[in-house]
Amino acid sequence: MERITLDFAIKAALDAAALMPEGYIYTNPDGEVAVELSLIGGGISCSYFDDKDGSPSCLVGHILHAAGITAQHIPAGHSGSGSHTLIEELEECEGLMVDTDASSFMSTIQNLQDSGVPWDDAIREGVSAYL
């Protein structure tokens, strides 16, 4: 399992965003599209991995997958939970190592993504906050 440093997390997030059309706004496996938080007063709940095929779904899921985490590693009940909570459990139960700044970056981009910010913009904001 790969240690998740800030550089690793940024690269994995950029790689995930490169797979999507420019301006991609996250759609969870249930087909719900994140919309701007200011428009409806809330965001959506992301899924780290697709329950149907196990593929990474949200930005944090892509980062975890790049580090060697699969859907089978995600404890029951963590779909839609905050990334800090999940990371703490994966560190304890699976031996995942995540640097503090990487964990904060992942939380930031997850919150932005879930409120409808396009992936490239969420990553850019996360990078500017932590570099």
List each language-model region with its residue ranges.
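Surface/interface-facing alpha-helical segments and adjacent flexible terminal/loop regions used
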Residues: 7, 11-18
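Active-site nucleophilic cysteine motif
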Residues: 51-66
